[in-house]
């Protein structure tokens, strides 16, 4: 079991000394499920990237804003948001640490089962 608070504080310390203003650690990897803590210093932006099939962002510290085509909401400590299913980035409005939860793929057998269940009649 990981202490997310301690991990987030450690990564924020690393981000402050990083030339790129960020630090991250993947703390859970189970099949298609990934969870990582990402720390960013104020003003640091993660460039736009593709979204996995399902993902959420939980802000542990600070404030962030999702960026991209449609813009995005500002999120503050304690808030959780589902990530949009479109290219997006992340901007730290102040020093911040977030937990990214992502499902990176769905096994083919599960996709077939879901597709069959969604097909009428």
Q: Which residues does each PLM region occupy?
A:
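A short, N-terminal "cap"/entry segment at the start of jelly-roll beta-barrel domains
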Residues: 1-32, 67, 114-121
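Conserved short histidine dyad/triad with adjacent acidic residue
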Residues: 20-21, 31-51, 85
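A cytosolic small-molecule/anion-sensing beta-strand core signal
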Residues: 60-61, 76-77, 94
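Short acidic-glycine-tyrosine-enriched beta hairpin
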Residues: 69-85
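Short beta-strand segments in beta-sandwich/barrel cores
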Residues: 44-46, 62-67, 80, 88
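Ligand-binding loop in jelly-roll beta-barrel domains
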Residues: 85-108
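Glycine- and acidic-residue-biased ligand/ion/polar-headgroup-sensing regions
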Residues: 52-69
């Amino acid at each position: 079991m990981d202490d997310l608070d301690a991990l987030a504080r450690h990564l924020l310390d690393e981000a402050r000394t990083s030339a790129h203003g960020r630090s991250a650690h993947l703390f859970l990897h189970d099949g298609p499920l990934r969870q990582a803590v990402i720390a960013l210093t104020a003003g640091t932006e993660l460039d736009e990237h593709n979204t996995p099939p399902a993902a959420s962002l939980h802000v542990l510290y600070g404030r962030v804003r999702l960026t991209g085509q449609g813009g995005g909401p500002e999120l503050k400590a304690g808030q959780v948001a589902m990530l949009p299913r479109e290219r997006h980035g992340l901007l730290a409005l102040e020093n911040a640490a977030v937990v990214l939860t992502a499902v990176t793929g769905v096994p083919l057998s599960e996709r077939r089962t879901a597709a069959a269940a969604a097909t009428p009649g």
